[in-house]
Amino acid sequence: MFSPARPTMVLGSSQPAEAVDHAACERAGVDIVRRRSGGGAVLVIPDEMIWVDVVIPRRDPHWDDDVGRAMHWIGEAWRQAIDPRALRVHDGRLVTQALAAQVCFAGRGPGEVILESSPTTKVVGISQRRTAGWARFQTMVHRRWQPVLMADLLTERPDERQLADAVGVVERPEPDLLAALVRHLTAPPT
């Protein structure tokens, strides 16, 4: 589990640096960094999200050579930990829209967790890095979402309502949520 020390705008691997308003980030006290995975930006703010990375070796029973299918088990663990009745794991291909090029949570990828009642609302974002010997799954859940701040920090200001609807917030107490997640992550594959 990671806890950011400062508010940070994390650019996706293919996102141009110009997508973010650097002056607005500086005024807001938001650092800018780039990750090696994903498409759109992610706004990471201390105490407003839960960021959990899981690394498995190739010999792990959860390993799948199919990169898309490989994320389903971790999405299912998050779904079970949060609320299995209200959520589902996206089992299709990557679904993007114009907003997803700017904001990671506006798209849906294989294994990501979305609201059953609103399939455009992402609750758990997942990205993956892998080598021949291991896979690292980077996951994030929002405990609070600030769509206006996110819009303010982007060069091309997106519609705030679309941003607000793109992200589902998890209000379950963090210790309980993490304990449930660990239980589901360590359960044998079915």
Where do the protein language model's features map onto the residues?
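A translation/RNA-centric and nucleic-acid-associated enzymatic feature enriched
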Residues: 124
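N-terminal lobe of the biotin/lipoate ligase/transferase fold
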Residues: 1-68
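Long, positively charged amphipathic alpha-helical accessory segments at protein N-termini or as interdomain linkers
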Residues: 75-103, 128-190
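Internal, conserved structured core segments that host functional sites
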Residues: 47-110, 118
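Short, structured patches in soluble enzyme cores that scaffold and shape functional sites
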Residues: 13-15, 54-58, 78, 127, ...
